[in-house]
């Protein structure tokens, strides 16, 4: 497979959301939909395009006038710009958004863009073939939940054949991962230790899909 993705969306349980479906406004796009901002956290298109976004850590200041980060993904899926050009374009406009981590793939390449409004420069990186774990801390944050997930995915992908159920076992794991001091992760919620699991259940917040 050119691309294998196993992912969860962690969000407030009461945030209105539609599960993955082909959008009637853009029938080539398969994605979930956030019904507040009308964007998406992850999706694919029939043109072989893929996009996914996570919010930056809670320690980064936010501003109310920011454009919804869910538009970062859907605009790429709807468009024809290459992943590299789109990522470069966003890099110059990243201060219009609150902190984010963005994955973009077209049929020829895959790119990662990390942006924090407090930084003078965003991070733009082409991803070579490999296994990557993305969290709210970024693609190279070293979060233990990501390292554990990467290890499990590596074991699955080394097999000649695997089932979707194998991927589901990875993202449905509720085991808590060992954690460094929470201050180093930029986390603030009282339930932060619970967020170390692949499948999060923390009061009013947790894994939605």
Predicted region positions:
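N-terminal nucleophile
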Residues: 1-209
């Amino acid at each position: 497979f050119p691309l294998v993705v196993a992912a969860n969306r962690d969000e407030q349980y009461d945030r209105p959301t539609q599960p993955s479906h082909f959008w009637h406004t853009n029938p080539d796009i398969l994605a979930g939909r956030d019904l507040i901002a009308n964007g998406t956290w992850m999706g694919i298109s029939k043109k072989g395009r893929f996009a996914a976004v996570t919010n930056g850590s809670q320690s980064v200041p936010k501003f109310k006038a920011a454009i919804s980060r869910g538009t970062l993904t859907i605009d790429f899926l709807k468009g024809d710009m290459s992943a590299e050009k789109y990522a470069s374009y966003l890099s110059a406009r990243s201060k219009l958004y609150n902190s984010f981590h963005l994955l973009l793939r077209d049929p020829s390449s895959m790119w990662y863009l990390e942006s924090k409004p407090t930084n003078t420069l965003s991070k733009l990186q082409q991803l070579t073939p490999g296994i990557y774990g993305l969290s709210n801390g970024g693609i190279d944050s070293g979060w233990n939940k990501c390292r554990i997930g990467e290890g499990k995915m590596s074991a699955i992908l080394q097999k000649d054949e695997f089932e979707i159920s194998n991927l589901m076992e990875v993202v449905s794991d509720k085991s808590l991962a060992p954690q460094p001091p929470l201050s180093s992760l930029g986390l603030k919620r009282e339930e932060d230790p619970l967020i170390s699991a692949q499948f999060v259940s923390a009061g009013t917040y947790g894994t939605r899909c």
